[in-house]
Amino acid sequence: MQIIKCLSKLLVFICPFVATAQSTFLPQGDKGYQFMERLEIKEQTNTNLNFSTLKPFNRRYIVEQAEFLDSIYRMGLNGVPDSAGNHLTLTKVDEYNMQSFLMNNTEWVTGAKDGFVSKQPILKSLYLTKPNLIEVNKKDFFLAINPILQLFAGKERGYDELIYLNTRGINARGMISKKIGFFTSITDNQERGPRFAQQKIKDLRAVPGVGFYKPFKTSGVDYFDARGYITFNAAKYVDIQFGFDKNFIGNGYRSLFLSDWSNSYLFLKLNTRIWKFNYQNLFMELTPQYQKTGDTLLDKKYAAMHHLSINLTKWLNVGLFEGIIFGRKNHFEFQYLNPIIFYRHVEGTIGSPDNALAGFDFKANVAHHLQFYGQLMLDEFKLSQIRANTGWWANKWGVQLGAKYVDAFGVPNLDLQVESNRVRPFTYSHFSTVSNYTHYNQPLAHPLGANFQELIGILRYQPAPRWYVNARIIYYTQGLDSLTGRNFGSNPFLDNRTRNSDYGYDLGSGRKAKCFNGQAQISYEVRENLYFDLTAQQRNFKVEGSSQNTTLVTAGIRLNILKRDYDY
């Protein structure tokens, strides 16, 4: 509890300085991310949108950019370029998405809002605006309340049980005097996934993406997911967020730094954006791996992360990352609260007991249609050992390279993405299992852990305003531990001192596993944020001596929530 008391005192100290407008954040997976990503690539030289590596996005900030780009587009329709001589081209579907995006973030829209009003409200008081069940938009107070629903059912070939997900909940966001923002989301869930997802839950002793759960009927799970935060400003360029939720660092489908694949966690985040720089400090309270033993207080561990993003040019953004995972018995290491210092130096000063990582990322927008991106993550390495090429176990690193192509081959609203991820054995692991790069029995970065090579291909196509076609192929190879328990470095939860030797570890060492995971989905937006989904998935997994093939078809509806996927 010491970290909670410390953060509370810090918040009390900062609050008196709150002076400028504050915003909530766009939920991860919101359709607005894909749209803003398209705008960034198509406009190419908008340096404000280039700061998109850190997610979730600040609503106020991205609405400002969307309205600015919308004005450029409308000036271009009249033959007038912007001050830099640029024209922005939007398709009819983009125009629809622009209206939808602004409508879903109405509290920050400065232009006309006539199109946001519902023609047929329910009971004359509900859905007065198209996206929100209840909306209050006054001078010093904003509140939006919406239901959450996800119901799908399907069949897996060769499996008699019904595959299903039943999610019900509510979310609310708001502002007080445009100085304090708040958000909360609560869902109750009952789920039975395909057999490989059921096995994943057994292996992890956790439901991917969520926390505590209970068995439900035959092979199902029951879990409650609650998130929430408050947000405000410490100064004109400094935003502060405190709450229980997730974060993501990267431009790809995966992240080798920090993903949103694990459970939510308590965090304090400071984000400073000024001139060509964006600097984020993230302090987190995490849960180490554990065995379910009934009602008992779980141990704590902690993390501190920095990310500095710089616009080197109007089209090129680079970033530096560092993070530290550490365990103290109910005690935060206060030296890691320093927001402007290299953690590796601090770790060495206090005796090197912790798990430090560093990284580099880049993103380049090219030719108004292409984006190239990547990450290099360094856990530990020695250049001499890399040159020796002996497979030294502690050369622990990961690399990501990817590309996005919008309006591919001249087809409007056809967007393609390809991504490669490679992570060496023993990466993210540590000699102290408390200090490994995990949270609540789940990896903090890539869901596969380590010792793998992965290739991802994604197609997104919106042929008409309310129709969405998505396809995704994931193929990976991984070296798993032997059946006799020999540690080949794929499992970040294991003490890395349990390895059999120091040399001879290459990517894929161990039992050879191969996996193909393909999915196609057609969605229709019945009304704002209400979707009907039809999904087909084929997964073929093979490891030495056994294989598991999954053919899955599901159909369902969802409201104000991202579709739950089984992408591992």
Question: Residue locations for each model-derived region?
Answer:
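Short, charged, low-hydrophobicity "junction" segments
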Residues: 8-16, 39, 114-122, 250, ...
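Generic structural marker for isolated residues within well-ordered, non-membrane alpha-helices
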Residues: 36, 227, 456
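Active-site-adjacent bridging/hinge elements
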Residues: 36-39, 238-245, 373, 377, ...
